[in-house]
Amino acid sequence: MLVMGRDHKLYYEAYNDASDLDGDGVLDVGYKPDKITYYGYYNSNVCYRANGTMFQAMSVANGSNGKKCTGAWSGDFLNYLTTSRMDALRKVLFGGYREVDTLTQTILRASYTPQDAHSWGKEYASVSHDGYDISDYAPLSAPGSGHYHLFAVTTLSDNGIPQLRVLADTTFRVWNWVSIERPVAGSDCFTPENKRVSCVSGGSRGISDYPLRVEVCSVADELRESNCKLYQNNTSYKPTGILHDYGENDRMYFGLLTGSYQKNITGGVLHSNVSNFSREINPLTGQFCLNGNCGGGGDVKGIVHTISSFRMLDFNYKDYTYGCGWIATRPVKEGECWMWGNPVAEMMYETLRYFGGATAPRPEYDINSSSQDIATLQLSHPGWKPPYTSVDKGGSGYSVCAQPTMTVFSDINPSYDDKLPGSHWSNFSGSGDPASMRNLDVSAEADRIWEAEGGGSKLFFIGESNNNSDNAPTPKVVSNLSTVRGLSPEEPSKGGTYYSAAVARYGANHKMGGSKFVRTYAVALASPLPKFEFPVGNARVSLVPFAKSVRGFGISATGNFQPTNQIIDFYVQRVANMAGSSGADYDATINGGRPYAEFRINYEDVEQGADHDMDAIALYTIYVNAKNQLVVTLKSEYSAGSIDQHMGYVISGTTRDGVYLEICDLADGHSNDGTRSSCAGQQPYKLNTPPNRLPGYCNATPMPGDCNGLPPVATRIFSVASQGANAVLLKDPLWYAAKYGHDQGVILNSSGGLANYFPVNNALYLRQQVAKAFSAIQSQAGSSGSIAVVGASVSSTSFAVIPSYSSTHDGKDWTGEMTAYRIDANGMIGDVLWLASAGVPSGTSAIAKRVIYTALSHVDDTNRASVVRRFVAEKLVDSSSGDVATDAAQVFGRLGYTPRGVIDDFGSSVTPNQLVNYLRGDKRMEGATLNTAPFRRRFGPLGDMINSIPVVATRRANYGWATASGLPQVQRDSYSAFINARQNSTAAEHIFVGANDGMLHAFDDKGTERFAYVPNGVLHHLGFLANPEYQHHYYVDGKSTLSDAYLDGSWRSVLVGGTGAGGRSMFALDVTSPSTFNESNVLWEMNSENDDDMGYTMGKPYIVPLQNGSWAAIFGNGYNSTNGRAVLFIVNLATGQLIRKIEARDGIDPDGSDPANMGYNGLGNLAVLDTDGDGLVDMVYGADLHGNLWKFNLSGKDPQRWGIAYKDGLGNPIPLFVARNPQGYRQPITGGLEVAVGPSAGYIIYFGSGRYFAANDNNSKDLSTLYGIWDSGSPVIAGRAALSAQIIQASDHPTSPDTRIVTRRPLSYLSKHGWYVDLVVQGQDPQGERSIATPLLQGGRVFFSTYVPGVSVNCASGGSNWLYVLDAASGGAALGQVNIPSRGSRSSIGNSDTGAVSTGGDAPIQSVAMTRTAPRQPVFCNPGEQGCPLVPETHAAPLDTRCSEVIIDPNDPTRSISLFRACGRQSWRQLR
């Protein structure tokens, strides 16, 4: 649910000239084209012409920054001048407000900006003053000496088009024009003598107006914006936003609840039930479903319509005031000043009620049909459809497993949000709420947060605490959060509370309707108001401008309420030396190189409504003197109002912190003569700080005489506090809402900040922060449990790719995604780099150009040229018969359909071209609603990725063949040249992954698909994907491997992959150059068509050089083959011809009835060994469904002599080891194997038992086991008796996440042949925990991932994962203490007996990914510090404190853990 504030602050300018836009510590004042690229509706690298009605792209910009234009407007400059916060938000979310949205044209229109202080302006003087030549960015020549070009954004009538106004070559400054008494940015300006005159006097060229409408998504590629997408009609490019990225393919579902106009200080209103965003878009044209764009009755007033319709209301152009007038003696009431009010906590409360099953809004929050929302703006007001309630009962019918999330978009200062159950200030009752909500007590929740933050009593700047209220940001004792309101320093009298955090905490600890807790993500828009931090020595002093109205319009200076002035504009005159001598703003000629700032603040004299314009201007001059003191001087410059205003600041970080009201406002039309006679009046007031008096001095009875007024100029000198400020500011409520709004606890990102709090300080980062929020939300669901890391030894180019999947619409739609994450220097997952779905071609022409190949039968070197084809309909005909119907039947038959079946499923008019184009990604035959057209509607371009694990081809890859002495010298030498050429090239790196859309996909390192291959083994049922009643099938679901190999006289990069559960097939592709992949690069495909021993190959294949000089692919035959045997395949890598098959027969009849789930056998995962160091394979270990661990001997050059290594006295093959449970029943082995050198000789093989692919496997409670088996080269191991046991025990104290103890019994290899760990907690019954992943060896430790299926009560796919870290030699605990960076700063869990940690997640983890930071790169803490883990010592990993490793959890990358490791070369040897 998108929860969105909609108050007036959204309509201020995006670039206010008083923000640090690029994070360099320096305020970015004015336009910085060489430093910053400004975000907005215009293409920053394009030149625009103004044609009188709109801006149009005309040419590519030039110059070294790519932004300069001659005689035209630079798009980047227009973004800087014209973008409002609302414009930026609209563009981020859905591409912008489309005023025109036709098939051939899109025109975006800027947000309405009334002619008051919401309007803004910029100015230009000269190259020497501003740093750029205006003629490079606008069709203007330089102004004359002492003159300025002024720019303003405003709207000149209530229904008018927003305008960019240009007042050229004038002597006036920008504040003389846009900060004048109403109307602003009009025809009048004020002079330095405070006189109102015509702006066109004094040599001005006059005012020119430019309507703020822009035509976007040009047909010219070089002019088109990067967010324009080509839709299927092949003519419409449309601007898109992040809702398109995450919602158009239904990866996420969105609803919208916002504040309302009618109830502006109460509650919130649902405008869109949670639904698919794609319903708001015409899938063929990309038009929004508004104004008849989706046919009769097809309009959808959803998220786009609502946010596009939002605007400022109630501004009257007759007198330039708001309808509520001047409210000066009390806070605003309901229905007054519609644009003010942001009750965020109450909106969040409504959202919890919605998730919890409520069927209607709270009456206190609801609006009626005569409201401004409905009657004026025509906003939608739908009936509530609770997401987890079934459709037949009026709900949306979503799965209880779907993760409910609130994403809150709001200014950091909520207001008036105290009308909630349990509120300190109201008797609001939740008795009628859903059952899950009835225990909500916001005061109790808020106080729990206070205690979690340390509790006690502290001094904070706040408007009210524990009934102590002065409506000012004065220091007050705070002892809880439940009685705090009046957010400071900006809005101490507007009733903003911390109840939003309380509501979030309640949702994170209570399940609302579904089976999961509600998670809160906050996109916090920084206040548009200024806050200045001054470096003073080694400390920082914070200063925020502040003013109060004290007399006029009935205000009583001694009453309970005096309006806090709104800061409605500010102008930085000069700022320097704020970032030290190396900073970009350093200037030794200004204040001796010490910090200096000079700025003007414009104050409005009431808190809301009125005329919302400048009523007083104060000039602030602040600098650090030679004594390292902060000097603050204020001067009253201008006034135009009938209310007396006292102006000052709130300061902290000094020895005299507090609220200072220092100066008066001037009498209207008077200039400042330095005496009190120029003031509007002299008013006694409790917050006054007369010269030489401190805060609180005037708050006395009787009031001292010198408190009777203030001067128009004041200077004060501050010293820095040696122990920090006495009083400080609380963080904003949204920060606490994020911190306590996640059911997994406090979640930190890799930089140590909250992973679900996204502050937006300026528009440049708005899209980035929203993308991070949505990415974090999307990563919660559907992980396939696998991961691939590019650059596990962390460098600047390291990244990880994680596949995921989702299922919707009763299992008729299964979509996949692969997300690439940056890996930060500390090894943790960082920002999202790209999404693979965005890189799959879309649009008819692009889909037609997709590079997709298939094979009409099995493939080898004898038939490759004839059977490998492009995957298009005409190529699926073996040879044309000349008869259309016959050829069509042949194509349909290859895809699994008879002509009758086509008619039954799709109708009689469907052609082979249409079906094949659909499978290539064409959506034109899908309906606008689910399954109303011939083909099934898909909500993403990729199929689900469940068992497939991505493999990565990197430029840095080096497989070591240059040092393989068993290879001929010419091959070794040429390999060195081959890898050097690759490493020095600029070629892209590539990621290969199979998906259940029937394809093996190849993506480059930017996420763009380069080619895809449809194996013949899945071709015969590929057409089923189009069936509207589709039930899930596996297709390309197997594992792949990648290596360099010497084929036909040259080195090539080869991928060998399998279809896994999707079919009985293995294939090999030459991927040396993925960008030029063609038919000849399909080397071979072997399937059950040409070999009855081929089964469903679930194991990973290997690419190896053999001792007979051949290169081969080696793999187990998989499961459920026709013959039902366990067979090792050795296939010529270049030709696909079979070199040798070796059956591993254990004497169990496949048709027999062995008690341990025997049935048919099959060989799964392997481990290959080079025992003599020559680079050639000598041995292979493999495991099967009968629990056998086999050893195959491949030594020697004669393939006929290769076979099973161990045999009985009769010459029958026997396994090295048979895995059995304590009762003697065999344990199937389907996970991977890992091998290390043994204690004195031989090898240790690591694996686990368990199965998770057959029917009823989910329900099995059979005991599985982790093993470390020593193959000493002598007699076969005689079962468990020959092994040492380690025991799992429950942790003796609770931790988060959960941990387990594993014993550390000593092991002597003189008497034992390894160890085992039964996957059952001592004293408990087996829960079905099993090992189906591949172990990972690192530094003397072995990492096992295990899975416990079906533990979720409500979600059939539920389960949990555990990570075991065991000593490789003994199997004892070796996890020790670990750092959990995502759960709190420096938190650690575990001790020397800890052997396992819960890693959560619903999907079984199939691979353990690890990154390693380089020595002396950042780690999360320093060993020995409080809460920082020590390095666990293991068999051969001595204590060291410089390096760390991170274990990445593919189910939830934000929950990955870090632990320290020994640096440098390890004595423990492992084989790769």
Swiss-Prot record:
GO cellular component: type IV pilus
Disruption phenotype: Shows twitching motility. Loss of increased twitching motility at higher Ca(2+) concentrations. Forms T4P. Impaired in the calcium-mediated increase in single-cell attachment to surfaces, but biofilm formation is not affected.
Keywords: Calcium, Fimbrium, Fimbrium biogenesis, Metal-binding
One Gene Ontology MF term: metal ion binding
Subcellular location(s) of the protein: Fimbrium
Chain positions recorded as Ca(2+) binding sites: D1170, D1172, D1174, L1176, D1178
Pfam families attached to this UniProt entry: T4P_PilY1
Key word Nucleotide-binding present: no
Keyword Calcium tagged: yes
Main localization category: other
Function: One of the three PilY1 homologs of X.fastidiosa, which are involved in bacterial twitching motility as component of the filamentous type IV pili (T4P). The twitching motility of this protein is enhanced by calcium, which may provide the bacterium an adaptive advantage in environments with high calcium concentrations.
Name of this protein: Type IV pilus biogenesis factor PilY1 homolog PD_1611
Species classification: Bacteria, Pseudomonadati, Pseudomonadota, Gammaproteobacteria, Lysobacterales
